[in-house]
């Protein structure tokens, strides 16, 4: 599953989009200052709107934060956890993250990722697990080949960002929960960058990388090849060794010098056999530790933030995505100069973006139009839309700003109670 248009994520900075619009060949020099003013107003409006969102979700998370004092289970209810997850879902979808299904996570072959090894996870430790991702693209990555003797480059489907939300099960084994470093009753959030789709399981705190069957076969084969000749020498002389031991323990009679020499030789071979076994076990353990280190390096070195620290980034990402969508939809509709149907505007935005930035996106036109209608920046006539003239658009933004600031100042920060200007 690889496609550049995997989700609604716009993989270009807002400043680049603004610069491209302000230098559009259809934008006159007289309109350029007003278009620049409009983007600033849009940024202010969505910042104000998402201020309410930020305060609301942070308040919901206070009782669920595992980083609060103590290490005892948190006394939280199912309803409390459910409300938080629903609000988190809204924020992430606004930031163009897409929830991944269990099948997508389970079917991802960990042997096709950067780790190139099987990953085992005790999922019974968790009562709720949610993966969100955005920006799937093929990334050229160097991976080990021939047991690390060579490296080769290959294209691996990789997400730009991944959010992992998990809640430990209240009925899970306390030993397993403690081993995973979790706290029951809490909600955990982890934000990652540049994670291969095949390595999603590596993000679990109790993930364990397995030594490959090929490596196990090599260790087993070398043990057999070296150990069988030693074992063949030990077995015939084992009776002599036992007799010598019995004599020294006083169980049997005296030991002849010839038997003693044979016993010493047998003991030496036996020690070599035991040493071989220990060496092979150390070899297996070393490869196992190497896999765990790679697991930690690849997954957790790409961790951007955890728990309460994720909210500022995610809310800012949501705000940024909303501004980019609304500004592109309005600006390109305005520069087109004629009313357009929603589907035509969608194609127009995607074509312009590909021509300007060389990237394919799946523009979320219905959401963009809904935002512009809410802010009174477009006029609907039947199934067509036209942009409000720039001076009027700025005037409507000013009015919306006043309404939003008054609502938040006097009515609290609940997002569903925010009002907008309707001409």
Regions found by a protein language model. Name each.
Residues 213-298:
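Transmembrane alpha-helical hairpins and terminal membrane-anchor modules
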Residues 337-356:
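Short acidic, hydrophobic short linear motifs in intrinsically disordered regions
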Residues 358-370:
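Soluble catalytic regions of membrane-associated enzymes that act on cell-envelope
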Residues 293-339, 361:
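Short alpha-helical segments that sit at the start of domains
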Residues 384-389:
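Minor-groove-contacting beta-hairpin "wing" of winged helix-turn-helix DNA-binding domains
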Residues 390-423:
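Short, amphipathic alpha-helical interaction segments positioned at domain boundaries
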Residues 369-383:
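A short, conserved structural fragment
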Residues 1-223:
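Basic, amphipathic N-terminal segments
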